[in-house]
């Protein structure tokens, strides 16, 4: 996609968010909740699932457009909304488009594009985070149906989603290779939402426990082939990690912009704190770290568009960008002094929203292990 086209999409997205999100965001943050109608509004604005095919009502754009929208949300400080958006548009929709049947795509994608259906992805369990082989949720065949039982935790969009892609064991003897994915309609009997999980940050991203008690799924709820769920998840992880990196770099850029504006205005000892050498050096360090990760992100985005992004590069990018996000925003907050620790100043939200980025989508520790394996073998 040409830079001019991408800039147009960015501008359109930013205008829509300034109009539909910015005036209400502080109230949503305080309430620790997001109105369900926002997703319909974003759908009407053409911002949901923009790189899905036109035949499903989407723009048929390049994936870079989805990443650009993610970046604008993150740069503006809407970290929680960006995470919910990423799950819906950057993960769930591509799963269905890439591995679903035509029947599944026609049933779900148009409604995801419009915002009528909000998507969630349910992999993590109380005893299975990074270790997919420890999943206990299971699906058993019963005639032409599957019977789903188990529970999931830390599920983004879990309180509001109408569609949940659930990872479940279908062949216990095969471990992770016996995992399948199912498209679960949240209106089905036996599907229950637990409590909303309160978090350190990202308060506008609802996070929930989900329970499945004898949920009867039709045969066509299986996404992809039976026992190929792990393969599908591994195939889609580079895109997920690219999206997280886009959030990380853009949020750091937004935090830096806030900080520069602050130090140019704030005075101490009779002069602006921007005139102090420590301030100037810290800002120079932060800008450099962001620029390095921006270059790596853009390179990986180009590789993804060409079908060349490797799992190794995606892991390095996710690790580097999220560690950078946390460290640079910490430096920015320090320059605000005590004000930076108050909710009144947005830098505190950038700080709180950043911390989870080193955990979800693969922890920094797992990313380092993956990179090491690529060099040294198992």
Task: Report residues per predicted region.
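Flexible, small-/acidic-enriched active-site or ligand-binding loops
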Residues: 134, 187-218
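Short Ser/Thr-interspersed hydrophobic loop/turn segments at strand-loop and sheet-helix junctions
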Residues: 46, 69-74, 168, 184-189, ...
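Long, acidic (Asp/Glu-rich), low-complexity accessory segments flanking structured domains
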Residues: 213-232
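A short, Trp-centered hydrophobic/proline-enriched beta-strand micro-motif
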Residues: 115-123, 167
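N-terminal glycine-rich flavin-associated loop
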Residues: 81-103, 129
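Alpha-helical interface subdomain recognition
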Residues: 1-79, 99-104, 111-116, 131-132, ...
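Short Gly/Pro-enriched turn/cap motifs at secondary-structure boundaries
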Residues: 85-86, 112, 127-130, 154-157, ...
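A short core secondary-structure module
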Residues: 145, 149-193
